[in-house]
């Protein structure tokens, strides 16, 4: 009986998630998204994306505390079933793990992924394809892990993925 209760609860949470988890970026016009991409990219010239506020010019190759330039570095991406049921649903949360997290939390659970700087250099076009691929794999959302220092590039990738048909919410 308890197993049925758990299954019913998971199903209810899944349905609620699918009803209410709409991608808010779909409400924005193409022009508004482009404006936000431009505005975010300007921040990279005197980087204050994170609380460290290094103010380095990442567009000129300068590296700040996060040791990141213009190119996104992704450790891994794929469906992840380890989140809470409303987020992971039945087919997983489309998780993208970014490297070089700027917080450097002492008790970070993703230390090897987020703080060791190992990963794959990725263009915004490739990131857009990764997002769309996660949707095609049936993921219920795009789950960005340690993304703060790459927000301008993520916005640019999002602008490229929307015309391809990306509709998943970002979490």
Predicted segments — roles?
Residues 62, 66-171:
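Conserved Radical SAM active-site core
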Residues 7-92:
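Flexible, acidic/Gly-rich N-terminal and inter-domain linker regions that tether
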């Amino acid at each position: 009986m308890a197993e049925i209760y758990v299954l019913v609860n998971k199903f209810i949470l899944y349905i609620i998630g699918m009803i209410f988890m709409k991608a808010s970026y779909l409400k924005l016009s193409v022009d508004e998204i482009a404006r936000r991409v431009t505005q975010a990219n300007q921040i990279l010239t005197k980087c204050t994306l994170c609380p460290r506020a290094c103010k380095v010019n990442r567009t000129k190759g300068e590296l700040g505390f996060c040791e990141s330039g213009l190119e996104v570095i992704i450790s891994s991406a794929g469906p992840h079933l380890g989140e809470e049921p409303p987020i992971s649903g039945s087919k997983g949360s489309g998780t993208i793990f970014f490297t070089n997290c700027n917080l450097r939390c002492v008790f970070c659970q993703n230390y090897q992924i987020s703080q060791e700087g190992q990963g794959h250099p990725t263009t915004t076009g490739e990131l857009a394809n990764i997002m769309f691929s996660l949707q095609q794999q049936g993921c219920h959302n795009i789950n960005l892990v340690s993304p703060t220092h790459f927000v301008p590039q993520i916005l640019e990738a999002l602008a490229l993925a929307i015309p391809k048909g990306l509709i998943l919410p970002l979490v």
